[in-house]
Amino acid sequence: MAIVSSKSPDPAERRSQAKTKPSVSEPQDSLVRPQAAPEESQRPEDQIRPQRLADYIGQPELKDVLGIAIAAAKSRQESLDHLLLYGPPGLGKTTMALVLATEMGVQCRITTAPALERPRDIVGLLVNLQPGDVLFIDEIHRLPKVTEEILYPAMEDFRLDITIGKGQSARTRSITLQPFTLVGATTQIGALTSPLRDRFGLVQRLRFYEVEALTDIVQRTARLLNTPLDQAGAEEIAKRSRGTPRIANRLLRRVRDYAAVKAPGPITGAIAATALELYNVDPCGLDWTDRRLLSHLIENFGGGPVGLETLAAATGEDAQTVEEVYEPYLLQIGYLQRTPRGRVATPAAWRHLGYEPPQASGQLTLQQLLTEPET
């Protein structure tokens, strides 16, 4: 299976075709953000993606659905139906597209929606697809409207309708395409338009991973990187990985670096814990910024409720960054609540940071939190 990455960063390329108080020390670049770092798609040793569906760890329901789809498509000698994968970043959407291409014995062309700025960008990709090829578009919710409209007949009828000329002299030309499979990936399925979403025959959600599955992923990656790692070490890394394989593999590489310099030999649970504490990743997967946000909420606002804009200003972060980058995991693990009146730190968050949760009698009732507007 050949992988073809299609990016159009410059015009020349187009023409040829992201009570113990929390530490207040300044953070390093976060290791627990799910967005891919640039080097993670460039270094040869990081090409650790599974190639077959049987090697893909986790997401059992998704694997069952796609296994049936692959077998059915092969039996009919057809291309797979178009597939939309959605869920938080770092859970394996790109990897699954590559696995599908391998299972079907075809090429996978990879691009992102922001790279498809002009109609000719998507047209160039579509006309060069071979029968059955997989076209993977990441961040598909960011497709320009004109590009999206070109995809409609391409997805439904494997046909391109191109308008040539302008005004009264304009005419439409249809180009027949080879049957292909479009795999779209998005973290914001609600941002997709209905006409585009309805053209996908399969719509599947990827969920956060359990510690057991992440432990298996860490052990597999360690074997591929020739890194000795015991069960306790793998579990220590897995439980700090925020349910995300991309983060698990990133933490493994940092622990491997630490062990190579400070503790040669197999990576144990103690070595992994020491290394990750050095990188400001605590046992729950929180980094410096996560702890600072919760600490501000507790120390400055009594645990809340407090409005998003106010909390963002107090922490020196942009409100959108707080809402889209930091809050999702805090909500997932039950350390933060969103209410109509604002953000509230849960008792679990108080205890995690070493504070004593306030008595319930001194807090607003749940009914008040759910009915009063955010300030």
From Swiss-Prot:
It holds the Pfam family RuvB_C. It catalyses: ATP + H2O = ADP + phosphate + H(+). Its main location: cytoplasm. ATP binds at I48, R49, G90, K93, T94, T95, E156, D157, F158, R199, Y209, R246. One of its GO terms (biological process) is DNA recombination. One of its GO terms (molecular function) is ATP hydrolysis activity. GO terms for cellular component: cytoplasm; Holliday junction resolvase complex. It is an enzyme of class 3 (hydrolase). Residues 19-28 have a biased composition (Polar residues). Gene3D superfamilies: 1.10.8.60, P-loop containing nucleotide triphosphate hydrolases (3.40.50.300), Winged helix-like DNA-binding domain superfamily/Winged helix DNA-binding domain (1.10.10.10). Residues 210-280 are annotated as: Small ATPAse domain (RuvB-S). DNA binds at R338, R343. Mg(2+) binds at T94. SMART domains: AAA (SM00382). Homohexamer. Forms an RuvA(8)-RuvB(12)-Holliday junction (HJ) complex. HJ DNA is sandwiched between 2 RuvA tetramers; dsDNA enters through RuvA and exits via RuvB. An RuvB hexamer assembles on each DNA strand where it exits the tetramer. Each RuvB hexamer is contacted by two RuvA subunits (via domain III) on 2 adjacent RuvB subunits; this complex drives branch migration. In the full resolvosome a probable DNA-RuvA(4)-RuvB(12)-RuvC(2) complex forms which resolves the HJ. The RuvA-RuvB-RuvC complex processes Holliday junction (HJ) DNA during genetic recombination and DNA repair, while the RuvA-RuvB complex plays an important role in the rescue of blocked DNA replication forks via replication fork reversal (RFR). RuvA specifically binds to HJ cruciform DNA, conferring on it an open structure. The RuvB hexamer acts as an ATP-dependent pump, pulling dsDNA into and through the RuvAB complex. RuvB forms 2 homohexamers on either side of HJ DNA bound by 1 or 2 RuvA tetramers; 4 subunits per hexamer contact DNA at a time. Has 3 domains, the large (RuvB-L) and small ATPase (RuvB-S) domains and the C-terminal head (RuvB-H) domain. The head domain binds DNA, while the ATPase domains jointly bind ATP, ADP or are empty depending on the state of the subunit in the translocation cycle. During a single DNA translocation step the structure of each domain remains the same, but their relative positions change. This is Holliday junction branch migration complex subunit RuvB. The lineage of its organism: Bacteria, Bacillati, Cyanobacteriota, Cyanophyceae, Synechococcales.
